């Protein structure tokens, strides 16, 4: 039995969240009655309102009046008044992943998981399938520039979704094709141990039906180990590793992007195939690897080499993934969501490959607990930055941890050999600090999952105001 068409209204608590908003938008486009609430106004809230969705700002019991079902994410606390009211009224309460799973049952699905690179890879798979006239439905964890939204309802048989592993609920998603980009120690507040994280990814792949397949990056040692443990499922490996079934070759930086080729090897059939002259308008090895995963899926689904080439060359990117926000006196300002040491290192390496000038990193650490648990990694991931400007920790709802703050991080970076580290007093001071450091040809890269994105977009104008 599938989600009945007559059910509704469907009420989303926290509808403005990037994961919740995409599901709400697709349900609305399918004809379901959708409503919701969020703690504050936002671009996502405004976009959904424009589609006719009623949204309350603030959470209170009266907001759920008339609802047939309540959808919540793990960010919603157990004492939320709307959640309490729904349970008191015996209204069914479902998790975000459960509702996403219901949508996935309507289509054949590609689900993209991994500690890093999910959003970009999801966008690339969507772009390639779209170019191949498969007209996919898409639910992503970031705004796809080509769509201006993180979700779209397609008319084809395929759906492409980002599978968020943070709370383990990605195991509920019925994927026909699974991508695993990498697996690092993250979300240990939920999983407790890294072994549990790895077990979850193994189960995610083994949940794929016998007629499906998984695409896994064996450049990552943990993923390579997982490949050896998974039985009775078809796996296509990818990466620069010579053992990869889809091997990334001849990667080179070119005009702010990358060029490369992908060589396929079918061990069972004993055949080989190569797609050459691939161009991606994004820099960085990490983005080329993400593209290789998407190419592997597209190739397996029968898209022509020429379609893949054209779609990749036209890829418009994802908001907050190496997004240029403006220029000032020849200085390029970049906004990026990177907030884990692995992501930060990859973004800064891409910036280094994109300019002969200096790379100036502006970082807003995200969560005290993450900075504490990965402190050594944070202190060693800025090697490609000539200067590091450190803002206060963005708490994301966490209470401060004694000794884990901006100044402690600054001292840690200096102790690890960074010679030019600046403690940022506040966002209003950023333009003045950057103006004193940057010259024509330099890149200023703003990094973090908090409100630093607003600083990145304001910075070009603030710098121009200084003269």
UniProtKB/Swiss-Prot annotation:
UniProt keyword list: ATP-binding, Cell cycle, Cell division, Cell shape, Cell wall biogenesis/degradation, Cytoplasm, Ligase, Nucleotide-binding, Peptidoglycan synthesis
Gene Ontology molecular-function annotations: ATP binding; UDP-N-acetylmuramate-L-alanine ligase activity
Keyword Zinc: no
A Pfam cross-reference name: Mur_ligase_M
Record flagged with keyword Cell cycle: yes
Main location: cytoplasm
Binding site residues for ATP: 114-120
Cellular component terms (Gene Ontology): cytoplasm
Subcellular location: Cytoplasm
Metabolic or biological pathway: Cell wall biogenesis; peptidoglycan biosynthesis
GO BP annotations, alphabetical order: cell division; cell wall organization; peptidoglycan biosynthetic process; regulation of cell shape
EC number: 6.3.2.8
Catalytic reaction annotation: UDP-N-acetyl-alpha-D-muramate + L-alanine + ATP = UDP-N-acetyl-alpha-D-muramoyl-L-alanine + ADP + phosphate + H(+)
Function: Cell wall formation.
NCBIfam families the UniProt entry points to: murC
Family of this protein: Belongs to the MurCDEF family.
Name of the protein: UDP-N-acetylmuramate--L-alanine ligase
Gene designation per UniProt: murC
């Amino acid at each position: 039995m599938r989600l009945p068409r007559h059910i509704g209204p469907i009420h989303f608590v926290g509808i403005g969240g990037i994961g919740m908003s995409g599901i709400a938008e697709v349900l609305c486009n399918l004809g379901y009655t959708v409503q919701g609430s969020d703690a504050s106004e936002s671009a996502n809230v405004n976009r959904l309102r424009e589609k006719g969705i009623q949204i309350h700002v603030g959470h209170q019991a009266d907001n759920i009046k008339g609802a047939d079902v309540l959808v919540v994410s793990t960010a919603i606390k157990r004492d939320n008044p709307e959640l309490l009211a729904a349970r008191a009224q015996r209204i069914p309460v479902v998790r975000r992943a459960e509702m996403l799973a219901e949508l996935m049952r309507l289509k054949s699905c590609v689900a993209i998981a991994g500690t890093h690179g999910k959003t970009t890879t999801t966008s690339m798979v969507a772009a390639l399938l779209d170019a191949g006239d498969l007209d996919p439905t898409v639910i992503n964890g970031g705004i796809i520039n080509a769509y201006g939204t993180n979700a779209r309802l397609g008319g084809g048989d395929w759906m492409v979704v980002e599978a968020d592993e943070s709370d383990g609920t990605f195991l509920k998603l019925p994927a026909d094709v699974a991508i695993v980009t990498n697996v690092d120690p993250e979300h240990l507040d939920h999983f407790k141990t890294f072994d549990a994280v790895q077990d979850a990814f193994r189960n995610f792949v083994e949940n794929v039906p016998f007629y499906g397949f998984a695409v896994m990056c064996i450049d990552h040692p943990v993923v390579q180990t997982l490949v050896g443990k998974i039985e009775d499922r078809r796996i296509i490996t990818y990466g620069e590793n010579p053992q990869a079934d889809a091997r990334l070759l001849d990667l080179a930086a070119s005009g702010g992007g990358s060029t490369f080729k992908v060589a396929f090897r079918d061990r069972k059939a004993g055949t080989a195939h190569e797609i050459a002259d691939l161009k991606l308008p994004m820099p960085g090895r990490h983005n080329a690897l993400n593209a290789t995963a998407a190419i592997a899926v597209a190739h397996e689904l029968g898209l022509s080499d020429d379609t893949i080439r054209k779609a990749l060359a036209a890829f418009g990117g994802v908001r907050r993934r190496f997004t240029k926000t403006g220029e000032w006196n020849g200085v390029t300002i970049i906004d990026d969501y990177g907030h884990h040491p692995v992501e930060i290192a990859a973004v800064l390496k891409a910036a280094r490959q994109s300019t002969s000038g200096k790379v100036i990193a502006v970082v807003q650490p995200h969560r005290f607990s993450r900075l504490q648990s990965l402190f050594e990694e944070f202190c060693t991931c800025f090697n490609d930055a000539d200067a590091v400007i450190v803002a206060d920790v963005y708490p994301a709802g966490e209470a401060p941890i004694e000794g884990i703050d901006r100044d402690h991080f600054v001292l840690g970076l200096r102790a690890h050999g960074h010679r030019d580290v600046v403690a940022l007093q506040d966002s209003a001071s950023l333009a003045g600090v950057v103006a004193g450091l940057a010259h024509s040809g330099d890149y200023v890269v703003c990094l973090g999952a908090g409100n630093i994105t607003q600083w990145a977009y304001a910075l070009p104008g603030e710098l121009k105001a200084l003269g």
